[in-house]
């Protein structure tokens, strides 16, 4: 499914020259990580008491280019310390401290990766901290899952990024209101270029109704583009994260073990190169998704598209020459669409889990394949093997990634 798109693009792009890596990132290819709002549930308080309040996790990763014999394209270590506790009978708090070592560059970094305090009542829950908040149904399509930015192409962590959020959920039986604000929206960082942010805050409102076997929701808000728009104005580079308005709708329907999903969003104010100017336009985003279970095997399908109603022949996108890394303009289509197909299963009584995902543009300008095999060696050690490749046309936005292949292994320890 499109869940693998950013996982693929970020992973195979780890060894690209940095000028191409981040400039190629675009909201339309956001993917990876299934969000979950379950922490807002009162039922989870008891589960926290059953687990150890402190946990350590160490990841050691190595990425290689099978077409080359030189040094690895990436080698890293991530150390997480997580702690959580209940706050009386109506709340909980957690924190995840992360330390990262890049063995190729020698760079060392520490951060509060995530942290949250939640206080719940019978009718609602207030949550403050740095965490992931779920919007939309078709994960990774970039239609409504726009609150948490996707990782950059050089980021080994392929999950969506926690944000500093304040949110309140109000429950009315099967209905639910959510009001949230992002106190400091993150945007993708481009090397040697500074981006202009049109806003310092985001806000959003969701009304959700759960029915038997299905639910639907409507959305509204003002947001900042997760990935700034790169433009050429009078032959000069200009990088801007525009503020835009959003109206959206989502729906899902369960049929037995299968789930069918739909997202729709109208976005007003997105950045777009038009002629020699970088301006703001309207866009309609939509996505269809399905999760089909056959026995123990899980199939995922998705189709997403973007429509520019104000499109003219002057609409274009900035692309990077894969050899010179010079910027140029590529005419933009009024419609753009992507697809995703994936399958996952396990064997040896669940000791081994595998997945295979194919994703790309419907016009054939880009195709990517990623496969993973996870070995649960014991309760404390998991080993992940990954193989990926990508092809892209010379006149596409991802031309600099054509022909890339990557093989990786990651060891994950829990103690």
What do the PLM-derived regions correspond to, one by one?
Residues 54, 89-95, 123-126, 174-179, ...:
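Repeated loop/turn-to-beta-strand initiation elements of outer-membrane beta-barrel proteins
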Residues 58-64, 95-99, 128-130, 179-183, ...:
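Transmembrane beta-barrel strands of outer-membrane/channel proteins
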Residues 87-188, 208, 390-392:
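Outer membrane beta-barrel
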Residues 16-71, 78, 155, 176:
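N-terminal periplasmic/intermembrane-space "pro-region" immediately following the signal or transit peptide
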Residues 252-359:
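Detector for outer-membrane/organellar transmembrane beta-barrel domains
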Residues 75-81, 111-115, 162-166, 201-205, ...:
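Hydrophobic, lipid-facing positions within transmembrane beta-strands of outer-membrane proteins
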């Amino acid at each position: 499914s499109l869940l693998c798109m950013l996982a693929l693009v970020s992973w195979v792009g780890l060894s690209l020259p940095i000028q191409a890596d981040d400039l190629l990132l675009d909201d339309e290819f956001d993917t990876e990580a299934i969000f979950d709002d379950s922490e807002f549930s009162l039922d989870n308080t008891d589960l926290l008491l059953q687990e150890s309040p402190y946990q350590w996790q160490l990841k050691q990763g190595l990425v290689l280019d099978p077409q080359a014999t030189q040094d690895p394209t990436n080698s890293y270590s991530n150390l997480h310390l997580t702690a959580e506790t209940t706050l009386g009978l109506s709340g909980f708090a957690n924190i995840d401290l992360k330390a990262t070592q890049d063995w190729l560059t020698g760079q060392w970094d520490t951060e509060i990766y995530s942290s949250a305090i939640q206080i719940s009542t019978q009718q609602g829950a207030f949550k403050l901290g740095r965490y992931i908040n779920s919007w939309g149904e078709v994960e990774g399509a970039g239609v409504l899952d726009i609150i948490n930015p996707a990782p950059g192409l050089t980021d080994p962590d392929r999950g969506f990024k926690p944000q500093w959020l304040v949110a309140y959920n109000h429950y009315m039986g099967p209905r639910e209101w959510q009001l949230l604000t992002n106190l400091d929206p993150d945007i993708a960082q481009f090397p040697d270029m500074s981006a202009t942010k049109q806003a310092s805050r985001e806000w959003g409102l969701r009304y959700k109704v759960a029915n038997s076997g299905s639910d639907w929701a409507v959305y509204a808000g003002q947001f900042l583009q997760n990935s700034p728009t790169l433009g050429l104005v009078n032959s000069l580079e200009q990088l801007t994260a525009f503020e835009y308005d959003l109206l959206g709708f989502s729906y899902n329907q369960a049929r037995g073990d299968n789930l069918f999903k739909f997202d729709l969003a109208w976005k007003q104010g997105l950045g777009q190169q038009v002629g020699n100017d970088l301006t703001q336009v309207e866009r309609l985003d939509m996505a269809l998704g399905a999760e089909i279970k056959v026995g123990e095997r899980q199939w995922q399908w998705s189709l997403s598209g973007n429509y520019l109603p104000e499109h003219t022949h002057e609409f274009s996108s900035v692309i990077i020459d894969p050899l010179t890394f010079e910027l140029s303009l590529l005419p933009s289509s009024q419609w753009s669409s992507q697809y995703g197909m994936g399958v996952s299963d396990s064997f040896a009584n669940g000791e081994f889990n595998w997945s295979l995902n194919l994703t790309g543009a419907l016009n054939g300008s880009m195709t990517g394949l990623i496969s993973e095999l996870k070995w649960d060696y014991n309760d404390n050690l998991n080993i992940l093997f990954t193989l990926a490749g990508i092809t892209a046309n010379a006149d596409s936005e991802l031309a600099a990634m054509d022909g890339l292949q990557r093989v990786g292994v990651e060891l994950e320890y829990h103690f």
